[in-house]
Amino acid sequence: MKTTIHRIAAAAMALLMAGVATANNWKDVDYVGDGQTGHKLDIYAPDDGQSTHKVVVLIYGSAWFSNNSKVDAFKSYGQQLLDAGFAVVSINHRASTEAKFPAQIQDVKAAIRYVRGNASKYGLDTSFIGITGYSSGGHLSSLAGTTNGVKTRKFGKVKVDIEGQLGQYTKESSAVNAVVDWFGPIDMSRMERCETYKDANSPEAVIIGGPSAENPDMVRAMNPMSYIDKKDPMFLVIHGDTDPVVPYCQSEYFSKALKDAGRLEDFITVPNGNHGPVTFNNETFQRMVNFFQRQAGMNETKLPQPSALNIRNQEYPRVLQDGRVEFRVNAPTAQKVQIDLGKLYDMKKGADGVWTCTTEPQSEGFHYYFLVVDGVKVADPASESFYGCSMMTSGVEIPYPAEKADRYKMKADVKHGEVSRVRYQSKVTGQWKNIYVYTPAGYATSGKRYPVLYLQHGGGEDERGWSNQGLTDIILDNLIAEGKAEPMIVAMMDGNSQDFAAELLTDGIPLVESRYRTLTTADGRALAGLSMGGIQTLNTSIMHPELFRYVGVFSSGWFKNPQPFMANSSGEPYYAKLKERPDYYNKQFREFYITMGGHEDIAYENCKAMRERFDQMGIKHSYYETPGGHTWPVWRESLYFFAQKLFK
């Protein structure tokens, strides 16, 4: 059974997540004044405090069969344009079953004239009006672009009134300033396998009012290429190369004609792109937005992106260009909803029961967050869950700037190691526990022995932290591939123990050295940890300096004043050991590396006091400080630099 463009386009749109306008919206505005559904439009203006906004008009795809799908067009990519600072005008047009061509392009022209005639009413800056559409909306958008200034045109015996006289703003211009065509049908004479006309029941036959093959003049009149000249606006054309509805060649023909006239900025081919799915993606949306911004003389911006830690297909939380995070929570019966992300943010409830808020800018990298619903702290079901803060939490990932991004991302051209979970029964506690072990690329076949970094998490976390939140394997893979770090094994134990040193020496090291090909001397061992794990590292390495040649302490230090929850929390027994033999420790520890997340790090004052005492004793150490507080972005960076100092 033949599937129409309309049905496939509708199905494709159903797969896309809806954006929601923020404020200043006008719905079902009658741009002609005749009360017809096909003559309604919606206006969405950004809620950014600006008095006016440049405009982008949206046209839906429906094979010209629908007269009321303007909401679908906005759901497709209207929010992206709104986020980029444009006022968005999503329009209906008459269906092909109620009015034949050129009624649809006349509707588009009338809507644009209405926008210009009412610019001050809606706060629209009509010095720039862009237009975009998908499928049949791509056709109408393209036709609107190539017919700037065209009132009528004759093709053979057919004279076509392109402009029309609809509405009361006939003296306004219907010209557009830039066009993005998403997989629109262009040449109706080559819709069947890029060779010939489709049959007499095709959507294009319906809008023409007869079989395409019998109406070649009208086919030419519908073809945007029939009107191309060097005065047309610039175009961006986007098409998936596996589109089963509108042949990919349609955009090839169109792009070539535009390029020949100097009117094509780019033709984007989406590999394996379908009629909507795959072709619609964050990258192509970004390209569309930046194209319109360039043409409008605006600064290019980066669109809000779903957090990399969202569950599949969840749009929120979204990360804005400046590091702020947008949240949406569907909780219609809740009385109060908050986001706990470094601080509490009250959310605002909409009429649809959806709560929203935008946070302050967050630093790069991973951050825990919670939902607080009527006073109950819970993980967000839209996010992956992580064990932190002594409970299962949610996480949001803030993109790194370009100069750091390569450190923390998977790369196709890098050989990757493996992280394995090993279950074992502790000889110290009798409990069954886990240890996560990273082995570098090539470990399985090299036959070599490797040094080991024993790497500990912080309080409220467990053995999963460095692998999941810390990206240990990615950091080491990239450093090793670049020759900046020696190939090494990394062992990540559960540090929630009454006697960590006993478990490390009795369980951890023997297990790793018996199951893996390791170096078994101090020269082949390093010990490091963050926060609580940093104190465990200090205590263990100072009491057993003969076992480790490299020591790393991240965002940690003994307390300036004794704490009741931790034995020897002020570190006095360990200071005494160091004071007895500073030269010995300086010789034993080839690298004693201390890092801190700046003044905002909760361990900063403790660490500062500890380092001052080290200096008084003559204990040599390296110190690195980076802004970010007591957070995983700081600890990832600590590992990144510490790993480069090991086993050399």
Q: What label would you give each PLM region?
A:
Residues 21-23:
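Boundary at the C-terminal end of the N-terminal hydrophobic targeting segment
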Residues 150-176:
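A conserved active-site-flanking secondary-structure segment within enzyme catalytic domains
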Residues 1-7:
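Positively charged n-region of N-terminal signal peptides that target proteins for export
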Residues 9-19:
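Bacterial N-terminal signal peptides
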